[in-house]
């Protein structure tokens, strides 16, 4: 494991995922992996519902060179102890901008909740994200001021907890250079992958999950 992402979702984690896969030449773990891979979903669902008391992080992330996005970022302190050589990247974003993106995501997710009754796998995603993210992180409250406070407090905690020689505070608008410096890698010739995961992309991902949900595991 070379990189652990400690930044919340909606801070450019899809762009970071693509960039790290290019620089490290391997797979980078993201929420999308959980949604599309039954074994990953099963592990997180059982963990969230208390069916397993402890997550086997090494087994969960076997085959990945980096991990980013929620719910990974919630457990960065525990995970960084398992992988002491890994660098920690805190993706940051203006708080107001983050809130707008997060709020749009929650609105899109709520509109798709009806599908949860039809697709068992989608229901499992809703159950584990509600427990781990909505309840455990945000205390079941999604008001703007409260969510921004939680977001900013998380970032401050990362800055205090992670040793400076392991931490990169990173805005994806900075492009390749900070990542390449951290990883001691040459700057790629191709443009940095600025991926905008908007409503269309989310609906496409939900659609793919629904299709997978109707397939036999």
Where are these regions (language model features)?
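PAPS-dependent sulfotransferase catalytic core
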Residues: 1-62
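PAPS-dependent sulfotransferase catalytic domain
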Residues: 25-29, 33, 48-61, 74, 77-169, 185
């Amino acid at each position: 494991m070379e990189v652990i992402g400690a930044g919340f979702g909606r801070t450019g984690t899809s762009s970071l995922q693509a960039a790290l896969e290019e620089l490290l030449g391997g797979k980078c773990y993201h929420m999308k992996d959980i949604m599309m891979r039954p074994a990953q979903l099963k592990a997180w669902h059982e963990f969230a519902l208390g069916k397993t008391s402890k997550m086997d992080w090494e087994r969960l992330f076997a085959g990945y060179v980096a991990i980013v996005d929620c719910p990974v970022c919630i457990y960065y302190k525990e995970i960084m102890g398992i992988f002491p050589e890994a660098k920690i990247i805190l993706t940051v974003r203006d708080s107001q901008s983050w809130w707008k993106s997060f709020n749009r995501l929650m609105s899109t997710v709520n509109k798709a909740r009806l599908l949860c009754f039809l697709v068992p796998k989608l229901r499992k995603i809703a159950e584990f994200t509600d427990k781990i993210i909505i309840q455990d992180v945000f205390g079941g409250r999604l008001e703007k001021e409260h969510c921004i406070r939680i977001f900013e407090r998380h970032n401050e905690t990362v800055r205090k907890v992670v040793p400076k020689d392991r931490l990169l505070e990173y805005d994806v608008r900075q492009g390749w250079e900070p990542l390449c410096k951290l990883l001691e890698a040459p700057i790629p010739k191709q443009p940095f992958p600025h991926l905008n995961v908007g409503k269309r992309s989310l609906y496409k991902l939900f659609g793919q999950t629904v299709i997978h949900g109707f397939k036999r595991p």
